[in-house]
Amino acid sequence: MGAAVTLNRIKIAPGIADIRDKYMELGFNYPEYNRAVKFAEESYTYYYETSPGEIKPKFCLIDGMSIDHCSSFIVPEFAKQYVLIHGEPCSSFKFRPGSLIYYQNEVTPEYIKDLKHATDYIASGQRCHFIKKDYLLGDSDSVAKCCSKTNTKHCPKIFNNNYKTEHCDDFMTGFCRNDPGNPNCLEWLRAKRKPAMSTYSDICSKHMDARYCSEFIRIIRPDYFTFGDTALYVFCNDHKGNRNCWCANYPKSNSGDKYLGPRVCWLHECTDESRDRKWLYYNQDVQRTRCKYVGCTINVNSLALKNSQAELTSNCTRTTSAVGDVHHPGEPVVKDKIKLPTWLGAAITLVVISVIFYFISIYSRPKIKTNDINVRRR
């Protein structure tokens, strides 16, 4: 019978490419069993990513070891941005805890498992593995810099995503109450987050005549028109004498609405195209596009009465506009320019030039000399 396989020699040799890598050369009494097991012992402190979005120190966390061993390999700044997850299975020498045995060539998890008494010297564990995850800022100054976009260089994504998430809502609510015309506040409002719309509804209920309230109304209509209607109602209820509010809160009078229809179709404060839409409730804004009439102004310079009859004539068709739902009240109106045929301008020019040349030719001709003829009648 042959002798049993015994381990005669163990030698640790350093790696070449990476100082963390080492080789454990195992010499047996039978040379065919000799092995060179490659392993690593982590010694770096990571301030960079080993691959996009993750850090994987060469450390095998075996049972009974604290996870603090993993976090000791990354700098404090990264510790705020990365979280530890369950890494891949690994093996480590018990007499060199944390060492990471490389699986390569004949050295596989199955090979180690089948070795007799292997568990006395080799332990199983999980490799330290960190992935990047957005994190919350710990101080108000950092939140202010990120949300106001004063300095976004080191801001986590959740605080630097054009206000798509709720993380800046608390800061922006207070910030924009003090400076509602700030471009960043208007960008926050354009994200159509309800805290932003509610904030501007409260602001415009006191300052509806401000320019930023025009943008507020444009943004919220039609989907969230109630925020604007509430602001207009409160403002006009507190400023009844403001002429801008006469369409939304007209002095009580039954005759106009009774005989002329909805006041949004005839009252100057409603129909004047130069007026801002923010002074109309949303339903008035829609109604104004559906008024079934053509309005005009009649100027009478003289009035002649004959047989108790008066006749007035006014051309109301020259300002005729389309009837019905012309456009959505949430979209700006673009007036079409009057297009004339291209040949018409050339024809008019040719006629004018011909007339000019005709008169020039007539007046440039020399006068015809004639003799005076005396005629006497008997």
Swiss-Prot record:
Transmembrane segments: 343-363
Intravirion side: 364-378
Residues anchoring lipid (N-myristoyl glycine): 2
PTM per Swiss-Prot/TrEMBL: Most cysteines are linked by disulfide bonds. They are created by the viral disulfide bond formation pathway, a poxvirus-specific redox pathway that operates on the cytoplasmic side of the MV membranes.
Keyword Lipoprotein: yes
Main location: virion
UniProt keywords, alphabetically: ATP-binding, Disulfide bond, DNA-binding, Fusion of virus membrane with host membrane, Helicase, Hydrolase, Late protein, Lipoprotein, Membrane, Myristate, Nucleotide-binding, Phosphoprotein, Signal-anchor, Transcription, Transcription regulation, Transcription termination, Transmembrane, Transmembrane helix, Viral envelope protein, Viral penetration into host cytoplasm, Virion, Virus entry into host cell
MF annotations from Gene Ontology: ATP binding; DNA binding; helicase activity; hydrolase activity
Stimuli inducing this protein: Expressed in the late phase of the viral replicative cycle.
A Pfam family assignment: Pox_G9-A16
Coiled coil feature spans: none
One GO BP annotation of this record: symbiont entry into host cell
Membrane topology (Virion surface): 2-342
Domain of life per record: Viruses
Localization (cell): Virion membrane
Cellular component GO terms, alphabetical: membrane; viral envelope; virion membrane
Membrane-topology annotation of the record: Single-pass type II membrane protein
Family matches, as InterPro entries: Pox_virus_G9/A16 (IPR004251)
Function, in words: Envelope protein part of the entry-fusion complex responsible for the virus membrane fusion with host cell membrane during virus entry. Also plays a role in cell-cell fusion (syncytium formation).
Protein family according to the UniProt entry: Belongs to the orthopoxvirus OPG143 family.
Known partners and oligomeric status: Part of a stable entry-fusion complex (EFC) which is at least composed of proteins OPG143, OPG147, OPG155, OPG086, OPG094, OPG107, OPG104, and OPG099. Formation of the viral membrane is necessary for the assembly of the complex. Interacts with OPG094. Interacts with OPG153.
Name of the molecule in the record: Virion membrane protein OPG143
Species this chain originates from: Vaccinia virus (strain Copenhagen) (VACV)
Lineage: Viruses, Varidnaviria, Bamfordvirae, Nucleocytoviricota, Pokkesviricetes
Originating gene: OPG143
